[in-house]
């Protein structure tokens, strides 16, 4: 489904023009890469916080600084994406429709509308979201929040028996995923100590999970496992798992496979339909730029979303069991209020309540930009710009060998095994000092205690010059931290 990058680039990354070019360490070289970047124009489609904004203690627009602001270095799209310029317009149009139409806004069309009437906004979100994750439109629903959606999906896909009751998950999964899996196992009266299989790194100095190790874990627990739930991209290390291979192998053992795509959607070129993934869920406030806590999304493969109307009211199951709500019901009968639930086919049949139209406007404002850019082009730039970041981190300054640097990169070096993010592990005792210098220079990244920072150039709004400036400041921060530590 959707567009794909050339196979060689997916496997090995693109040819990097700066590997043997000493000019790559100059700001002019970074600026030349920006001048050639086909996505460079999208930077102007986002609101970049200024250095002054980051220090302000008020939000009153009448107290804006008089002089021209200096943009910050925002490399934190893996945590919270920046606001598209168009978001304000989308929300203003929604507020106007609500103000002028009230309840009739659910059905009234407008000649200049940015979204359909309230009753159909979820369909608009699914239409734009599907190509981003490589899905059919019917396989995607924009709804809920990430952990809520994981529970909704596991309520349907995790149907444990005395023989098959385990869920396999990475040992350092994002805590909310861990809690969700643990509570699902408890909910079905199993003990998580036995029912929860945690995949840990084989080498604790290298916190990534080799595909072969994951495959062996699946084989070891195959006869007793019901579901495997992994992160498409691991939030801490930035590792991009081999979704296609892991999914196929687990399914060959009779295991249902789900993926948390929070750090993958809008970041890498997913093909959830073609990879035969059973189910997936993701948030939209990271690379998809919908705002804090924005409406999330889920994926249900078409084979699981079928509704057999001929079996309704028979002893056979006409559709997959699920937690049900009125917004997942057949649109033709939704407002009859007859309490006879027949779901819409596909992922839409897993919806519970009508979506927040306010939130959906913020989601769609960003998704329209992805439609213009395409995931293939976004991934292509991501491979280049994150490769450039890695090159500068490891090789600048020229007189410092990488083994003598006060940090290591724990994200896989193979571009096919990562997205935009690089996770950088500092030597003990340096993190707070480094963060202080970065903050003083209006560099926005995030940290994971005790010693890791995560840096993620977002292809739609970050530039090669951003990356060059970050590496310069980061080197300075490391030198100051080493002196402060003594």
Swiss-Prot record:
Stored InterPro entries: Kynureninase, PyrdxlP-dep_Trfase, PyrdxlP-dep_Trfase_major, PyrdxlP-dep_Trfase_small
GO molecular function (one): kynureninase activity
Catalytic activity of the protein: L-kynurenine + H2O = anthranilate + L-alanine + H(+); 3-hydroxy-L-kynurenine + H2O = 3-hydroxyanthranilate + L-alanine + H(+)
Gene3D superfamilies: Aspartate Aminotransferase, domain 1 (3.90.1150.10), Type I PLP-dependent aspartate aminotransferase-like (Major domain) (3.40.640.10)
Annotated family: Belongs to the kynureninase family.
EC number(s) per entry: 3.7.1.3
PANTHER family per record: KYNURENINASE (PTHR14084:SF0)
Pathway(s) served: Amino-acid degradation; L-kynurenine degradation; L-alanine and anthranilate from L-kynurenine: step 1/1; Cofactor biosynthesis; NAD(+) biosynthesis; quinolinate from L-kynurenine: step 2/3
Cofactor: pyridoxal 5'-phosphate
Keyword Transport appears in the UniProt entry: no
Cross-referenced Pfam families: KYNU_C (PF22580)
Main location: cytoplasm
Gene expressing this chain: bna5-1
Domain of life: Eukaryota
Stretches the record annotates as Disordered: 53-72
Quaternary structure (record): Homodimer.
Organism classification: Eukaryota, Fungi, Dikarya, Ascomycota, Pezizomycotina
Matches recorded under HAMAP family: Kynureninase
The protein, known as: Kynureninase 1
Keywords: Cytoplasm, Hydrolase, Pyridine nucleotide biosynthesis, Pyridoxal phosphate
One cellular component (GO) term of this entry: cytoplasm
Top-level EC class as recorded in UniProt: hydrolase
Binding positions for pyridoxal 5'-phosphate per the UniProt entry: 146-147, 174-177, 231, 260, 263, 285, 326, 354
Functional description taken from the UniProt entry: Catalyzes the cleavage of L-kynurenine (L-Kyn) and L-3-hydroxykynurenine (L-3OHKyn) into anthranilic acid (AA) and 3-hydroxyanthranilic acid (3-OHAA), respectively.
Subcellular location: Cytoplasm
GO biological process: 'de novo' NAD biosynthetic process from L-tryptophan; anthranilate metabolic process; L-kynurenine catabolic process; L-tryptophan catabolic process to kynurenine; quinolinate biosynthetic process
Modified residue annotations for N6-(pyridoxal phosphate)lysine: 286
């Amino acid at each position: 489904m959707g567009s794909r990058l050339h196979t060689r680039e997916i496997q090995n990354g693109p040819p990097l023009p700066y590997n043997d070019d000493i000019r790559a360490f100059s700001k002019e070289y970074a600026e030349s890469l920006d001048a050639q970047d086909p996505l460079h124009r999208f930077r102007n489609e986002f609101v970049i916080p200024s250095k002054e904004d980051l220090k302000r203690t008020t939000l009153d627009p009448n107290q804006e600084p008089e002089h021209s602001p200096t943009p910050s270095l925002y490399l934190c799209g893996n945590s919270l994406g920046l606001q598209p310029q168009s978001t304000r317009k989308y929300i203003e149009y929604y507020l106007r429709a609500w103000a002028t139409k009230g309840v009739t806004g659910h059905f009234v069309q407008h000649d200049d509308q940015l979204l359909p009437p309230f009753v159909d906004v979820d369909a608009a979100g699914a239409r734009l979201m599907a190509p981003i994750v490589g899905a059919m439109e019917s396989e995607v629903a924009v709804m809920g929040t990430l952990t809520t959606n994981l529970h909704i999906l596991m309520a349907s896909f995790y149907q444990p028996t005395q023989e098959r009751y385990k869920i396999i998950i990475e040992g350092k999964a994002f805590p909310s995923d861990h809690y969700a899996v643990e509570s699902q196992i408890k909910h079905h009266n199993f003990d998580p100590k036995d029912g929860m299989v945690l995949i840990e790194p084989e080498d604790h100095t290298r916190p990534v999970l080799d595909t072969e190790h994951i495959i062996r874990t699946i084989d070891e627990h195959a006869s007793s496992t019901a579901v495997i739930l992994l992160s498409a991209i691991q939030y801490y290390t930035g590792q991009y798992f081999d979704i296609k291979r892991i999914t196929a192998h687990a399914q060959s053992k009779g295991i249902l496979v789900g993926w948390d795509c929070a750090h993958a959607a809008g970041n890498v070129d997913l093909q959830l339909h073609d990879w035969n993934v059973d189910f997936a869920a993701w948030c939209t406030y990271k690379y998809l730029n919908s705002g804090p806590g924005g409406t999330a999304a889920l994926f249900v493969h078409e084979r699981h979303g079928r509704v057999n109307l001929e079996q309704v009211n028979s002893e056979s199951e006409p559709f997959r069991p699920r937690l049900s709500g009125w917004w997942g019901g057949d649109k033709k009968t939704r407002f009859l209020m007859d309490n006879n639930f027949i779901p819409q086919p596909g992922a839409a049949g897993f919806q519970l309540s009508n979506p927040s139209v306010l939130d959906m406007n913020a989601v769609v404002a960003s998704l329209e930009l992805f439609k213009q850019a395409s995931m293939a082009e976004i991934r292509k730039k991501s491979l280049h710009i994150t490769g450039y970041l890695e090159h500068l981190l490891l090789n600048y300054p020229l007189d410092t060998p990488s083994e003598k640097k006060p940090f290591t990169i724990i994200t896989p070096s193979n571009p096919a095994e990562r997205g935009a993010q690089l996770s950088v592990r500092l030597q003990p005792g340096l993190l707070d000092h480094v963060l202080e210098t970065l903050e003083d220079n209006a560099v926005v990244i995030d940290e994971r205690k005790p010693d890791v920072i995560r840096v993620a150039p977002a292809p739609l709004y970050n530039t090669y010059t951003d990356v060059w400036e970050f590496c310069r400041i980061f080197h300075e921060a490391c030198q100051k931290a080493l002196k402060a530590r003594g």
